[in-house]
């Protein structure tokens, strides 16, 4: 794999963390980086804030400190935090059924699905029973009606399967019914705005040309499903080993909006999949968690408890065992994202990753625009950077087991 021969690294890096800058540059020279940024706080101090490369494939738009990049499922960490804040404030109860707040959702055997089940990807509500055209997915109410009417794909609470797209719709509808705000509005007014963090779910069209990086090399949903050998329209998860993937990824192809109308996709709100963020924004967000500005330590200790062990995920398969799910966050059960197996955060298809480490007081964010969908949320471009942060803190790093997953 080749890379850029010469790249100018912008930003700042405390002397103790200079190896992060070195590896960040090597991402461009050796690991095929196009445009990217990394930021990290340690004990509340910004120690790394670097960016470089191009925000577009033609090299005409230099990456800036506040360049926004899509993090796809990294959005879930933002959305989960909003829900946990509401729960800690007493505005909702995660143990109650979703139908307590959204009565229509209780149809078709879903009456006992709790918010906690959704957070843990154990509700079975991974998609409706019929596919939707990408234009239909721009209609929030229509999607919610389809989800409310659908039977779960397994008995709620008995198995684990990644709620790839439905996660954002289910939690988003509950947040709206409780607060009167969308998740994007709540995130802006109650979390990101007060922090000054550049993390957004929904970016106005007129801001996108000079703010947003273009995704490069990102496969479409159809390409990924075809590559995985997934069936087109399964009626049961018993139909095919990839039936769960086909349902969760293919039912409501909000990603196909990005393929057909990228501006529209960024402008809409999909609280599970389309946040536009800067690396500094994500590091600021997760640092606020470390500093207990958003949630209490008691809540954070609960949300990072492994849910369902490391059983095979009915959507993503056995590879999930390497990280495992907490209550709305990706964990680090096997240590593929650094030495602390108690971090919590979320990665996104393509390589982005952000996390909070309460033990070592780290808030970390890495974003990029050249996609590599083979690394399953342990992209070497990010892992080498976060590992250097740990090394600077004197934390031993075990050798990384290089893995490319075959679904």
Spans of features found by a protein language model:
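Hydrophobic core segments within long, regular secondary-structure runs in both alpha-
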Residues: 21, 116, 141-148, 386
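Active-site helix/loop module of the DD-peptidase/beta-lactamase fold
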Residues: 65, 70-74, 86-126, 130, ...
């Amino acid at each position: 794999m080749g890379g850029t021969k010469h790249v100018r690294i912008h930003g700042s890096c405390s002397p103790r963390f200079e190896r992060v800058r070195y590896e960040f540059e090597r991402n461009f020279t050796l690991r095929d980086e196009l445009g990217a940024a990394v930021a990290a706080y340690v004990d509340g101090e910004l120690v790394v804030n670097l960016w470089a490369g191009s925000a577009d494939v033609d090299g005409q738009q230099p990456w800036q400190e506040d360049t926004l990049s899509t993090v796809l499922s990294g959005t879930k960490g933002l959305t989960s935090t909003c829900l946990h804040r509401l729960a800690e404030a007493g505005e909702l109860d995660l143990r109650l059924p979703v139908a307590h707040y959204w009565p229509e959702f209780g149809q078709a055997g879903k009456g006992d699905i709790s918010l906690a089940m959704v957070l843990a990807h154990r509700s079975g509500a991974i998609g409706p029973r019929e596919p939707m055209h990408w234009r239909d997915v721009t209609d929030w109410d229509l999607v919610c009606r389809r989800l409310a009417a659908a039977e779960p794909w397994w008995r709620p609470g008995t198995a684990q399967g990644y709620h790839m797209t439905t996660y954002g719709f289910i939690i988003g509808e509950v947040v709206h019914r409780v607060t009167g705000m969308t998740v994007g509005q709540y995130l802006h007014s109650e979390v990101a705005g007060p922090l000054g963090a550049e993390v957004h779910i929904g970016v106005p069209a007129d801001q996108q040309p000079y703010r947003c990086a273009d995704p490069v090399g990102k496969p479409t949903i159809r390409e990924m499903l075809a590559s995985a050998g997934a069936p087109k329209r399964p009626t049961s998860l018993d139909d095919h080993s990839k039936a769960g993937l086909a349902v969760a990824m293919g039912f409501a192809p909000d990603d196909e909006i990005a393929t057909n109308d990228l501006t529209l996709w960024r402008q809409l709100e999909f609280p599970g999949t389309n946040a536009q963020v800067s690396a500094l924004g994500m590091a600021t967000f997760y640092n606020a968690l470390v500093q207990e500005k958003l949630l209490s330590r008691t809540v954070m200790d609960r949300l990072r408890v492994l849910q369902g062990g490391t059983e095979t995920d009915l959507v993503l398969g056995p590879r999930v065992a390497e990280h495992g799910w907490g209550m709305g966050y990706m964990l680090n059960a096997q240590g593929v994202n650094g030495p602390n197996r108690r971090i919590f955060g979320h990665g996104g298809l393509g390589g982005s990753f952000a996390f909070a480490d309460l033990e070592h007081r780290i808030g970390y964010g890495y974003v990029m625009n050249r996609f590599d969908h083979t690394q399953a949320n342990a992209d070497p471009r990010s892992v080498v950077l976060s590992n250097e942060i740990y090394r600077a803190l004197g934390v031993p790093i075990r050798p990384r087991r290089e893995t490319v997953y075959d679904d």
